C-alpha cells in the first residue's frame, strides 16, 4: 500500500514539474503595459526622481492623467485614475522602486488582473500613404479621436476627410508634407 502511494506521489510530482506553472510572457503579451511602464520608468530616470514607492505612486498618477486610449485603460486597471474601481497601484510602485524590470511587473499584474495583458495598441494608419476616401467613417472618426479632436457638424464622409486634411499639419506634420493630394 505504501509503495503505491509513493509511486503515485512521485507521478504527481513529476507531472507538476513538467506542466508549465507560471509561464513567462510571450512576445506580444502585455504590449501596452510593457510599453507604457517602460516609458514611465525612463521618464522617472531622466528626471532624477527619488525611487521610493510613495513618490513613484504619485508620479504614476500624474503620468496617467495624460494617458489616452489603451494606456488610459491600463491606468484604470491598476488604479491610477480617479474613477478606478480597484487600487493595485502598489503592485507597480513597490517593484519599480527596486528597479525590477517592467516585464516582470507586467507578468505579476497579469496574475492579479488578466485584462491588463489583453490590452493591445490599435493598428496605426499610415496617413502619408492611405487614401482617406477608402476608409470608413468609423476609421476617420478614430483618427480625429486619437488626436483629441471631434468634428462637430460633420454629416458626410467628405466632411471628416476635410477636417482630417485641415488638422493633419498640426498632428501629423510628416504625413501632411508627404501627401501629394492636399
From Swiss-Prot:
Induction: By endoplasmic reticulum stress. By hypoxia. Induced by the ER stressor tunicamycin. Changing residue 179 to K: 14-fold decrease in secretion. The modification Phosphotyrosine is found at residue 76. The keyword Manganese does not apply. Residues 129-172 are annotated as: Interacts with HSPA5. Residues 1-24 form the signal peptide. Belongs to the ARMET family. PANTHER family: ARMET-LIKE PROTEIN, MESENCEPHALIC ASTROCYTE-DERIVED NEUROTROPHIC FACTOR. This is Mesencephalic astrocyte-derived neurotrophic factor. The gene is MANF.
Amino acid at each position: 500500500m505504501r509503495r503505491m502511494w509513493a509511486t503515485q506521489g512521485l507521478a504527481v510530482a513529476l507531472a507538476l514539474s513538467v506542466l508549465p506553472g507560471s509561464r513567462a510572457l510571450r512576445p506580444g503579451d502585455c504590449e501596452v503595459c510593457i510599453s507604457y511602464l517602460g516609458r514611465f520608468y525612463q521618464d522617472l530616470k531622466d528626471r532624477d526622481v527619488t525611487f521610493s514607492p510613495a513618490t513613484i505612486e504619485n508620479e504614476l498618477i500624474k503620468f496617467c492623467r495624460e494617458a489616452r486610449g489603451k494606456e488610459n485603460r491600463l491606468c484604470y486597471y491598476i488604479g491610477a485614475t480617479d474613477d478606478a474601481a480597484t487600487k493595485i497601484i502598489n503592485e507597480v510602485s513597490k517593484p519599480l522602486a527596486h528597479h525590477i524590470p517592467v516585464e516582470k511587473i507586467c507578468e505579476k499584474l497579469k496574475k492579479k488582473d488578466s485584462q491588463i495583458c489583453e490590452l493591445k495598441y490599435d493598428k496605426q494608419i499610415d496617413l502619408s500613404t492611405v487614401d482617406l476616401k477608402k476608409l470608413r467613417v468609423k476609421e476617420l472618426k478614430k483618427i480625429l479621436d486619437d488626436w483629441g479632436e471631434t468634428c462637430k457638424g460633420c454629416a458626410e464622409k467628405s466632411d471628416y476627410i476635410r477636417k482630417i486634411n485641415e488638422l493633419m499639419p498640426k498632428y501629423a506634420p510628416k504625413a501632411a508634407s508627404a501627401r501629394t493630394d492636399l
